[in-house]
Structure formats: structure tokens, C-alpha cells
UniProtKB/Swiss-Prot annotation:
Protein's organism: Salmonella enteritidis PT4 (strain P125109)
Entry function: Pore-forming subunit of a potassium efflux system that confers protection against electrophiles. Catalyzes K(+)/H(+) antiport.
Matches recorded under SUPFAM superfamilies: NAD(P)-binding Rossmann-fold domains
Gene that this sequence comes from: kefB
Domain RCK N-terminal: 400-519
Sequence similarity: Belongs to the monovalent cation:proton antiporter 2 (CPA2) transporter (TC 2.A.37) family. KefB subfamily.
Membrane topology per record: Multi-pass membrane protein
Name assigned to this protein: Glutathione-regulated potassium-efflux system protein KefB
Regions that span the bilayer: 4-24, 29-49, 55-75, 87-107, 111-131, 152-172, 177-197, 207-227, 230-250, 262-282, 284-304, 324-344, 356-376
Amino acid sequence: MEGADLLTAGVLFLFAAVAAVPLAARLGIGAVLGYLLAGIAIGPWGLGFISDVDEILHFSELGVVFLMFIIGLELNPSRLWQLRRSIFGVGAAQVLLSAAVLAGLLMLADFLWQAAVVGGIGLAMSSTAMALQLMREKGMNRSESGQLGFSVLLFQDLAVIPALALVPLLAGSADEHFDWFKVAMKVLAFAVMLIGGRYLLRPVFRFIAASGVREVFTAATLLLVLSAALFMDALGLSMALGTFIAGVLLAESEYRHELENAIDPFKGLLLGLFFISVGMSLNLGVLYTHLLWVAASVVILVVIKMLTLYLLARLYGIRSSERMQFASVLSQGGEFAFVLFSTASSQRLFQGDQMALLLVTVTLSMMTTPLLMKGIDKWLSRRLNGPEENDEKPWVEDDKPQVIVVGFGRFGQVIARLLMANKMRITVLERDIGAVNLMRKYGYKVYYGDATQVELLRSAGAEAAESIVITCNEPEDTMKLVELCQQHFPHLHILARARGRVEAHELLQAGVTQFSRETFSSALELGRKTLVSLGMHPHQAQRAQLHFRRLDMRMLRELIPEHSDMVQISRAREARRELEEIFQREMQQERRQLDGWDEFE
């Protein structure tokens, strides 16, 4: 692509994302499907704005690369060792069983057995990018099914290496094209990368961090990710696997959170680009001429993978309420199929339109997953939120709730337990199925689903409740829920969790005055203990804490008008100096006053 063409393509991608994703969210079909539809619209089979799909698709794989790096940062080697049973047990079983069944069906569809084997392996893989994105949206990350899903995806990435090595063997060209010496050199280079990364990455980042320049740290992070991806690509291996390993090597370093913050903005944009590229690659011409074949293939692919995954989840001991989510989120074909099928095509394994048919099947199967997840979500909501048939009902089952608590993570649990201990009637909304089942055992009245849906709020008793406590992890969900409550349930007294000052400003601007910054109170308490440890009298330390809390809240409110202004930083510095002066003046004034505790303690 020329420079001007690349810039034009970038503008088209951004326009497609900005136009399609909000529309998809309004229709309730999810951001991923919105990206796919946007890609179809601007691709060669849509409006035809972009025709060089292969080059863009290869570049857009960087979205998956960045995603795998961040996942690697969240896992250390000891954690991977703990997951070995699910990775090499369930993951291997899923790939082998699905590939065997699908290969057999492809042979019945007049594929040569060599092409059927490659096709079965490619179709057995799932989309890492789509599955992880949907698991995050559905709150599956913390659940047992989410952890098992990640293990399966990780094994699939590991399976890339032998699958690519298998293609020339099946093509009957092993003697000409398969050089065992080159394979050995690739393995050696991979081992050198592991050893070098283990002992060099942390000292290098320590040296870079010592410069104190944030931009250099971000540049070094990008250099690491892109270099690892390029190195693995040069070896003929999975780029995503290379960056995942780099992330794991840095998972126990002191720079883990800084690395994640540096990469996160690029990850989101490039993942969107990847899904748009997949939509662009959909060959509508093949779809029109082989409509029944493609439709049957998509249904068979999804059903076989779901049945296989459901059976494995049952054998692994996953709760029945989580099995359908686990099976559906991994039921699609994956991005690896594009690479594997292209390699097989270069070895002349496929005949006629076989490769095009397989790629259309993979693309359409990816489009079915968000819709399938949405349908299963509704089914689970009806099943879990309906009247219970057993006699073990919570003690508040027939009462209208006084308070609705949204989210039952560590923050929400403390609030719910406090309210229950004081005999308040509460209803909890939670989208983690495992947490829902556990809470019901302890007598909580709980509804499963997305709290940003008005129907769920109404079913949970929002019209009769007095207050709603919002403890969502994502600030976007919190603000959307605040807007919904103000629009549909204006009588509700809204109390919310704020992750920091930025979220607190947004809540204040939305009219929510009752909120708690999750780390502020605990930090103040630890600060009070620090003052006492330095020799300050406990009562004086308590007063210092109260003064700081009051003055900090005042400054927080005063800075609201300038929250989005360029002068915010200078105003914040001025406010900090003012706070210090007022704090010192008031503390000196109180020290002159006699206090019974100070005098006689």
C-alpha cells in the first residue's frame, strides 16, 4: 500500500468503527459483530472502498498480538503450571476430537484426505480475539469456565507449530520442502529467546524506567511486543504465541501494570481493525453460489464444536449453568484458519473453491458467536431469574427490595454483607454465573444478567426499591447504569463506586453525590496509622485524617468545571498547595486548644 492509500484506509477504518459499533450497541448485538458488519460494508464485496484485504488482515493480527501480551502479563509461570491439566488435557482433547470429526465430514464432502485433515485442524481452532473479548464482556474472566476457556485457547496457539509443520508432510513434499535442520534451528532460536528474555528483559526495563521519561517506556514496550511478533513470524510460528511468552516472562516484574497501561490503547484499536478485516475477507460471491453448502457447514461446525466443548466441560466438572457459555464462546472458527489454509493452498492441497468455502464458513461462524451468546444469555436469565422450584428460598424472596446492589465482587460483597447483617432487604445483580449460584446458597436474592438492561432492573424490583448501589468494575458500565436509573427510575437514590478521581468527577457531573473512591478510604486509614507510627498522638492523627478527607472532597468538587479543560493540571497543583496550607493552619489552631484526650491520655 502507498502512503496515501494507507492513510485513506485508516480513515475508512475509523469511520466504519465509529459508525457501526454504536449502532450495533444500540441494536444490542455487541461491538464485535458491529466491527464484522462494518468490514463487510467497506470491503471488496460491499461498497468496495478497500480491495487489498490480505495485506490489511496480516497487519491487523497485531491486535491479537497485543491482546496476548496483556494476557501473558496477567499470568506467571507458576500459574501456567497450575493450568497444565486444563491446557494439555481439555485443550488437547478439544482440538483432537473436533479435528477428527470435522475431517471425517470433509472427506464425505469430496475433500482429499490430506485436505480434510488440514481443514479439520483449522476448523477445530477458535478465535482467540473474539472469545477473549466476549468472555470479558460477559464477565467470564473470573469464572471457572472462563479460566478453562483461556486454557483451551492457549493450547490452540501452541498447536499452531505442529499444524504448520504437518502441511508439507501431507502435501507429499517433505523431502523437497521440509528441512529438519531448519526445524532444529528454529527450536534453538526459540529457546534462545526464552532464556534471553528470562534474564535480560527486567534489567533492560529497569534501565529504561530510570530515565523517568514515560514516552520512552511506552516506545520500549511497543518495541518489545513488535520484535517478539516479528521474530516468531520469521520462524514461521504464531506471532501471538511469541508475545504471550514475552508477557509471561514479565508477569512477575515490578513493571507489569505500567506495561499493561502502555499497551492497552493500541490493543483496543488494533483488535477492532482485526474484526473489520475479517468482515472484509468474507467472499460473498462464493456464499451466493454455494449458499446451502455454506449454511449447512456453519451450522455443523458450530454444533460439533459446542457438543465437544460441552462434553469436555462436563467431564472437567464445570457447573451446568456455565457449560453452555463455555461451549458457545469457543464454537466459532478462528483467525489461525486463514494462515493454515493459505499455507495448504500454496502446497496445492485444496481443489477448486474448497479453500474459499472453508474461509467463508470460518468467517460466518465468527459472526454467529455474538448472536449465540446473546441468545444463551437470555435463556440463562429466564432459567436463573425465574421462580425457584425447590423449598430452599432466601428469606427475602417474597419481599420487595429496599436496595439493589449491582455487582458482587470484593467491593460489592462487603456492602451486601453489611446490609444483610442489618436486616435490609437487598437484591443483587450479577453476570458471573458461578457467583450467582454461590450467592443463592448463602440466602441472597440474586438475578443473573447485564444490569445495564432496563428489563432486568425492572424484574429485580427497581420500581419499588429505595436505593441502588453500583459497584461495577468498568466505569463505562457505571455511567450507563446511572443514566438508565435517572431516566427510567428517577426515584432511586444512587450510590456508586468510583475507581479514582476521574470517575468521581464523572459521577459528580452526572449528579451522583453519594460515591466512594475504592482506594481512598483505605489509603487514608493506612496514612493515619503511618502518622501514629511516626509519633503523632492517635487523636491528632484521627483529626488529621478527617481534615484531609473534608478538604480533598472540597477540592474534588471545585475542580469539576475544569475536569476537561487544559488548565486542569495547573489548577490541581494550585489546589494541592492550598490544601497543604489550610491543613497546616487548621492543625496548628487545633493543637493550641485543650483536648481531654490529648491532656489525660
